[in-house]
A protein has these predicted regions:
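Short, His- and charge-rich active-site/binding loops that engage polyanionic ligands
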Residues: 1-59, 83, 104-105
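Short, structured beta-strand/loop micro-motifs enriched in basic residues and often containing a Trp
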Residues: 41-45, 114-121
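Extended alpha-helical targeting/anchoring segments
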Residues: 48-56, 69-95
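Tight coil/turn sites that cap or link beta-strands
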Residues: 65-66
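Short acidic/glycine-rich loop or secondary-structure boundary segments that cap or lie
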Residues: 69-73, 91, 101-103, 121-122, ...
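A motif-centric signal for short, conserved binding hotspots located
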Residues: 83-116
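C-terminal accessory segment of soluble enzyme catalytic cores
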Residues: 105, 117-185
Length: 185
């Protein structure tokens, strides 16, 4: 099942179900490893993978209740669930790409935009101690229409800001092992 995205098409919001990862796996050359789940805001307009979509302002929002990041404040990492302090849904800035499939139908894929979180009072707690800290870009709900309708890449860049730490919350959320098949308890 894909993720729902919100986009503006013909001056109306549309809900699509694209796949995560900007380059669909079937379009990656055998033996090539290409990770496109996230795109760095600092280079999204320069990298060949994203340059065209960024120039065309193919901007989307990915609605979420939470996302997960590894916290390394202990000797071994602990998965954390991160969301709004209010528990309300929010949306993350993303970039989409349209594909024409062999059957002639259109499909969509997306990448989430990230920014440095080295100086963020909350998001700097995540990822390995020796790695750069990154965060998804949360777009305030008051800016949804402006983000989705933005047709100027430099103006779009002004939305790629750290979200206020005091409006965010997180807690440990270790993965629960799935029960083995054919077991009742």
């Amino acid at each position: 099942m894909g993720h729902n995205l919100v986009a503006v098409q013909s001056l109306q919001r549309s809900l699509l179900t694209p796949t995560i990862g900007f380059i669909r796996k079937r379009h990656v050359q055998p033996g090539q490893r290409l990770t496109t789940m996230n795109a760095r805001a600092e280079t999204v307009g320069q990298l060949r993978t994203y340059k065209s979509a960024w120039a065309k302002s193919q901007l989307y929002l990915v609605p979420m209740l939470r996302f997960f990041e590894p916290n390394w404040e202990q000797p071994t990492h602990v998965r954390w669930s991160i969301g709004m302090a209010t528990g309300e849904p929010f949306a993350v800035a993303s970039l989409y790409r349209e594909w024409e499939e062999e059957n002639g139908k259109k499909s969509f894929s997306f990448t989430q935009l990230t920014i440095s979180a080295d100086d963020h009072p909350f998001m700097n707690r995540f990822h390995r101690p020796d790695e750069e800290k990154r965060s998804l870009v949360i777009i305030p709900s008051s800016d949804y229409d402006e983000w989705l309708g933005c047709k100027n890449p430099e103006r779009a860049r002004t939305y790629l800001q750290p979200y206020p730490a005091e409006l965010m919350a997180g807690q440990p959320a270790p993965k629960v092992a799935a029960p083995m098949q054919n077991e009742l308890f």
